Amino acid sequence: MSKRILYKDQARKALERGIDVLAKAVSITLGPKGRNVVIDKKYGAPQIINDGIAIAKEIELKNHMENTGVSLIRQAAAKTNDVAGDGTTTATVLAHAIIKQGLKYVSTGSNPISLKKGIEKASQFIIQKISENSRPIEDVKSIIQVSSISAGNDEEIGSMIANAIQKVGKDGVISLEEGKSAITELEITQGMKFEKGYISPYFITNSEKMEVVLENPYILMTDKKITLVKEDLLPVLTLINKTNRPLLIIAEDVEKEALATLVINKLRGIVNVVAVRAPGFGDRKKALLEDIAILTNGQVISEETGLNLETITLDVLGQARRATILRDSTTIVEDKNQQAVHARCEQLKNQLLIAKSSYEKEKLQERLAKLIGGVAVIKVGAATETEMKEKKLRLEDSINATKAAIEEGIVPGGGTALVHISANLKQWAKINLSSDELLGANIVEQASLAPLHKIAENSGKNGSLIVEALEHKNFEIGYDALSNSLVDMYDAGIIDPAKVTRSAIQNAASIASMVLTTECVIVNRDKKNN
């Protein structure tokens, strides 16, 4: 296929047009009075969402040049989502503001490399100030406030997530399930998460989230490598095929021919199967497999137990209510074998008492925490499928934001922290930077006002007047869009996780710098022009 090549201003203008399209669609959702976006799906009902990254993923433009701009700014949202789990709309608004202002300077002769250096230095200054001004999150009230805001100012959901985190801990597993009624409920159940994911991406059932979800699966656990198709795999696949239930295989490894057989079975719809490598090493691997076996009421197939894959029967397989497998983790939810799990926990506590080395104690405590901690399951209730999808997206954002707040603390929300820090940045840049680097820092200083500006605009107010009203106010004073007044953001419960704000400015500056230093764009020709 022939290529289309654009240079200099022409290239940057084409990228800018695509960036404008995505930023406009995403930014209308920002703030408590932000609007929704309706997305027409190829299959099923249209989806109503106000989640930045979900909207960004849906935008594809006909013009390949402009679509490259869309892809670039989408990265700012995606990276922020990967690191902090929220703040994708803020990252998009910031990146767009830096790019728009930066391109004006580039077109009038400023050096893009010097601008980039200024942008990087300014973003590092802001990140440092966010860290200095963040408050540790210490009480349940603050947790509820963070989770409520990220869930679209829904206090009921905020309380539920705070309750879930209290019960399973900040590192605990919170799983979302589709409920069977219109009411959203929280259930604490037994389960376990371990740090191993699917061996092959061909097992994925949800390509949007890159995950595999198995409902009511059988679980095969073995400390052996699965290598032979006829001896190791066919017996269990034949058994599972008759049950019409999915299968999760946890093994030392699955070698090429055997893995290919599993993938073919999966793709052809014969058996819904996924394979993951067993967690841990050596004796610890065997112990962890035994823990999983006790949780799921199954047995580990190994030489020590006298069981083998050729003569396997259904009664040695474990069972679970649900299994969710990501690229690097697996979560199993099961609550029917409570007595055996409790006995196993007591056994581990006794082993802890006699353990001699600190390493051994640490590993035993890890295993105990996995079994005792359990899994918080939020059953999402909704009247329609469209509402269900929208609610699940809000809950995911809320869970991620709350965990981020516990990790790095909180700052005033609603774009307030960036507005106050931008005033400090202006003074610092005047003293420490010069020429085009100073211009780069000024770009970031102006862009830092953009999130609050957009929140005010979405509330029907003049963004410039709101930003001006915050000048010379204390750090905690900000704009409450719901009441249209200046308030103490901590007292009002309008707070953001510091990690989310930090990630948003960091990724926005990174992507914007790349766009500003672009001198040539090469894309495939549009079909109609080919």
Curated annotation (Swiss-Prot):
<dbReference type="GO" id="GO:0140662">
    <property type="term" value="F:ATP-dependent protein folding chaperone"/>
</dbReference>
<dbReference type="GO" id="GO:0051082">
    <property type="term" value="F:unfolded protein binding"/>
</dbReference>
<keyword id="KW-0547">Nucleotide-binding</keyword>
<dbReference type="Pfam" id="PF00118">
    <property type="entry name" value="Cpn60_TCP1"/>
</dbReference>
<keyword id="KW-0934">Plastid</keyword>
<dbReference type="InterPro" id="IPR002423">
    <property type="entry name" value="Cpn60/GroEL/TCP-1"/>
</dbReference>
<dbReference type="GO" id="GO:0009507">
    <property type="term" value="C:chloroplast"/>
</dbReference>
<comment type="function">
    <text>Together with its co-chaperonin GroES, plays an essential role in assisting protein folding. The GroEL-GroES system forms a nano-cage that allows encapsulation of the non-native substrate proteins and provides a physical environment optimized to promote and accelerate protein folding.</text>
</comment>
<comment type="subunit">
    <text>Forms a cylinder of 14 subunits composed of two heptameric rings stacked back-to-back. Interacts with the co-chaperonin GroES.</text>
</comment>
<keyword id="KW-0413">Isomerase</keyword>
<feature type="binding site">
    <location>
        <position position="496"/>
    </location>
    <ligand>
        <name>ATP</name>
    </ligand>
</feature>
<feature type="binding site">
    <location>
        <position position="414"/>
    </location>
    <ligand>
        <name>ATP</name>
    </ligand>
</feature>
<keyword id="KW-0143">Chaperone</keyword>
<dbReference type="InterPro" id="IPR018370">
    <property type="entry name" value="Chaperonin_Cpn60_CS"/>
</dbReference>
<feature type="binding site">
    <location>
        <begin position="29"/>
        <end position="32"/>
    </location>
    <ligand>
        <name>ATP</name>
    </ligand>
</feature>
<dbReference type="GO" id="GO:0016853">
    <property type="term" value="F:isomerase activity"/>
</dbReference>
<protein>
    <recommendedName>
        <fullName>Chaperonin GroEL, chloroplastic</fullName>
        <ecNumber>5.6.1.7</ecNumber>
    </recommendedName>
</protein>
<dbReference type="InterPro" id="IPR001844">
    <property type="entry name" value="Cpn60/GroEL"/>
</dbReference>
<dbReference type="InterPro" id="IPR027410">
    <property type="entry name" value="TCP-1-like_intermed_sf"/>
</dbReference>
<feature type="binding site">
    <location>
        <begin position="480"/>
        <end position="482"/>
    </location>
    <ligand>
        <name>ATP</name>
    </ligand>
</feature>
<keyword id="KW-0067">ATP-binding</keyword>
<dbReference type="GO" id="GO:0042026">
    <property type="term" value="P:protein refolding"/>
</dbReference>
<feature type="binding site">
    <location>
        <begin position="86"/>
        <end position="90"/>
    </location>
    <ligand>
        <name>ATP</name>
    </ligand>
</feature>
<comment type="similarity">
    <text>Belongs to the chaperonin (HSP60) family.</text>
</comment>
<keyword id="KW-0150">Chloroplast</keyword>
<dbReference type="GO" id="GO:0005524">
    <property type="term" value="F:ATP binding"/>
</dbReference>
<dbReference type="InterPro" id="IPR027413">
    <property type="entry name" value="GROEL-like_equatorial_sf"/>
</dbReference>
<dbReference type="InterPro" id="IPR027409">
    <property type="entry name" value="GroEL-like_apical_dom_sf"/>
</dbReference>
